Structure formats: C-alpha cells, structure tokens
C-alpha cells in the first residue's frame, strides 16, 4: 500500500508540474468540448458559458484560483490538498481512464491490422478458387515437402476441396520465399489443355496463332494482373479505413486522456507508426501480387537435372568428354558419401568369413593330429603287448634255440625304432601344418581388416605416430619427410613385420609407470633424454634406454627386464590417467570434446591399436594369432564370433599337446622293448 501511494504521488506531482509549466495554453487552442470536459472532471462550475471566447476569458480570470499558489499555502493546507489528490479513489479513476484509452487504441490498431490481413488472405485464397481438385493435388504433390514421399501422396486423395485450397494457400507462402513471388512454377503442373479450358471458362479469347504454352501462360498472367489491378481500389480503401480508425483513436485519446494526455499521445504515436508500417508492408505485398511477372521454368535447368541423374546413376546424355568426366566425378562423390556404409558392411562380411575359415582349418588340423596320436598310441600299445609276448617266447626258447632268440630281439628293437620315428614324423607334420595355416589365416585377416579401414584412419595419425609405426617395424625413415611420404611408407609396410614385445610392453605403461622405469634404468644410458614429461616422449626415452641396455649392459639386467615382456599384449588403459588418454588420442588425430568420456576414449584407442600393433611377437595366446583375431573381431563388430577365435587358439594348443603325448607314448614303448631285449641278451 505504501509503495502504491508513493507511485500515485509521483504521477500527481508530474501532472502538477505539467500544469505549472504549460498552464492552460493547450486548452486555449482546443475546442470548447475539451475545456468543458476538463472543468467537469475537476468539479469546477463554468455556468452557461459555451463559446471559445467565453471559456478563454473565464480561464484567464480564474487562473489564480484554478491553479493553487503552493508557495503561499501553510503546511496544513498543503497536507489537506495533497491528501485529497492522493486518495485511492482519485488515483484509481486516473488509472482506469488510462487503461480504457489504451484498450480502445489497441482495438483500433488491431482492427486496422486484421482488415489488412483479411484483404491479403482473401486475395491469396482467390488465386486457387478456380483450380480443380486434381490440379490442386498435382500442385501440392509437386511443390509441397510434406506430400513429396510416395507413401504420403495418398493423403491428398482424402482431403476435401476446401482443405485442398486451404493447404495450397499455406504452402504458397513458403514457396514464394523459395522460388519467387510470381514465377510460372505455380502452373507447371497444368497441361496445355487445362490452361485453354481455364481461360475459356473465365472468358478470355484465344486465337489460332496463340496455341503454344508460352502464349497461354502470357494470357493467364495478363488476366490475373488485370484482376489484381481491379482489386487495388479495395486495398487502398482498406488502408484508408485503417488509417481513419487510427486517426479516430488518436482523437479519442486526445479527448479522454486528461492530465495523462502527454503519455497517451506518445503511445498513440508509436501504435500509429506500427499500424502504418504493417499496412505499408501489406500494401507492398499486395502490389507484388498484382504485378504477376515471373520466370519461365528456370528452376528446372538442364545442368541441375543432369547433376541429379549423374549422382543417382541414371543415364543422361553427355555431349562432350569433359561433361562425361564431370558426370563420373559426381557419381564417385555420391558413392563416397552415401555408399560407404554398404562397402564397409561388405568388408565386415569378408573379414567374418576369414575368421570362420581360420577356425575351421585349425579344427581340421587338430583332428588330424589327434588321429595321428591315436594311431601312434594304438601302435605303441600293440607293440608293447607284442614285446611282452616276444620276451616270454625268447625266455622259453632259450634252451632250444639261442640264435633264434637273438634274432627276434633284434627284430623287435628295429620295429620299435621304426614305429617311434613314424609317429613322431606324423605328429610333427601336423603341428607344423597347423602353425603355418594359422599364421596365414591371421595374416589374411589382418590384411583384410587393414584394407578396409587404413584409408579412413591412418591419415589422421600425427607424423610422430607414423614414424613410430615405421620405427617399430625396422623401416628406415628419412630425416625430412612430409606427411604424404610417411603415409606412403606406412601403406607399403602395413602387412609386413610385427611390433616387438618390448615395444608393446612400454606402450602398455602409463606415464607414471614409464617415469618409474626410466628412473630405475637410466643409469645404463649415457645419451641425452628428452626433458618433456608427456607420455609420447617418455615412451621414446624408455625405448632408447632399452636398446642401450640390450647392446652393452649386463645380461642379468637384460634378463630381468625381458622377463616382463612376454606378458605384454596391447595397452589395457585401465591404469592410465585421463591426461595419458588425451595425449594418446591426440597422437592418433582424434578430437577431444569439452566433456571427456573415459570409456569412449579407451574404446577409440583400442580401435586404433588394431591397426598400429597387429600381431605382437610373443608366445602367449592373447598376444599372438588368437589374441589378434579376437581383437579384430571385436573391432569389426561381430563380437558373437569370439567363441570361434577362442576355439582356434585351443585347437592349436591341442595339436602341441597331442604331439607331446604321442612322442611320450612311443618313447615309453621303445624303452619297454629295449629293456626286455637287454634281459633276453643277458639270459642268452
């Protein structure tokens, strides 16, 4: 309540200031109605006065009594007068007058705007009144994006005539901004016969030499332009009516605003300018419609159609070799941007087949080795039984025929040696075949994977990463090499060699672990280390120290270091800090978002590692052929095939175990025979 009283007092003081500053000079220029209104609202009797001169004389004579001389008033009189002028009823009355005046002004402006908008909508809707339903459907199917799809064209058949016209009028707004206000595209769905029929229906004569489409369109445009010109007076009348309403609203405000006249006049002026601006814009738009001057099918240029046909593989006439060349370029660009997914899917399928083939071959090799082992074991068992029987025969025949016993013992010994040699050869051949086949399959799988993705990934690698790739494979790198030269070398040696396990070991370590390793072994290195503490340079320092140790240091130190290498596969990244991960991604040329996702970063690094490492030179299954195939399978997206890759590793190990068992069985059989032969010889 207190804030309201203060605000009201401020309004009242502004009114008093206005009266003291300008006096009644404004009302001396106005008509008597304004003076009467002011006197009545302030409860000042004016008697029978009616003419302007009477009121001017009355105001001049009574000026001192009407305008209080506050300087001469006592404090009591001032408080009394201000109390009356700050009563809530008095202030509410002033506020109500201002609100009513504002509403009337707003209503007048809205009426003017609505009248202009109605005239425009009526003019726009009349454009499609004479169209048939089929013409409207063809127009919308051709130009409206919401009905462009084949499955949505059936919706047009269900729309009523009124809905078709309403939809066409709405689409017209969007199309005019896109294709131009008055282009011939509006009628490009009409046939020549439909144009003639329409002109005939509206009474436009067509002579025999005006039968071409260009003549028909010109006739149609002239007719519409004439009708638009005839409607121009109506548009001007609407504008005049709106202006008159705005003027009347301004006069009404001038009559009713009272002491707030200055404020309301300002609002009236702003609203009048806004209304005038909108009416002017509406008039200009209607004027544009009346011109009806547009283009003749320029939107469907031959070059645009050819470009569309070329990109989508549609045969189009190419008059010259250079046109054929550009058509080929457009086709290749489309395949690169839109056909890449199909090509990549095909590569995935091929890599999947390679993995299946690897598993099948290894399984067959293992089966063959198992059969060889079983044959060797069975033969050894039979030979053992035969050896026992023969030994008994030798002992019993000792008294009868000494020479015969000696001959049989020699035969048994020769047979055991022959059987052991044959079994060992078969098992060895099976194991060698399994290892050779698995190596070929792994190489083929690696080649297929890399052929699929090297062009899209390695080009993002930094120069330092490309040099490291070549360095770890023993490929000499020129001192000054450009990015293109490095890429050529990487592509050339992509499927050659493998990363040594000591390099793989260092790449599994975080920057903290690398720093600790360097601190422990740098005493064996007398060269200069890079001072930077980022992971890239720490890795280079560790490699330099290891090579120095391998060349000169004590063998016990080297063996201690190398004992950890067979455990190295590829980086697991679990112990790496976020800064290490970001540094590694930066080396691979991957972007790092504002919000760092650790899990996503690790996945991206593992995908790059498939290309960078390949099969790591080590004896463990995880870092050898089987591990590489599993990582390839995971990267290519067919994780369900992991069982096949695991089985491949198991089958290879089974071949090795089978060879060991077969050799052991044959050796045992040979030892048994040898023992019994010696016993027989001692007896003899």
Swiss-Prot record:
Keyword line: Membrane, Nucleus
Primary location recorded for the protein, binned into one broad class: nucleus
Localization per record: Nucleus membrane
Keyword Membrane included in the entry's annotation: yes
GO cellular component term, pick one: endoplasmic reticulum
Domain of life: Eukaryota
Stated role: Has a role in maintaining cell viability during stationary phase induced by stress response. Activated by the spc1 MAPK pathway.
Self-association and partners: Homodimer, and heterodimer with bis1.
Protein name: Stress response protein ish1
Originating species: Schizosaccharomyces pombe (strain 972 / ATCC 24843) (Fission yeast)
Name of the encoding gene: ish1
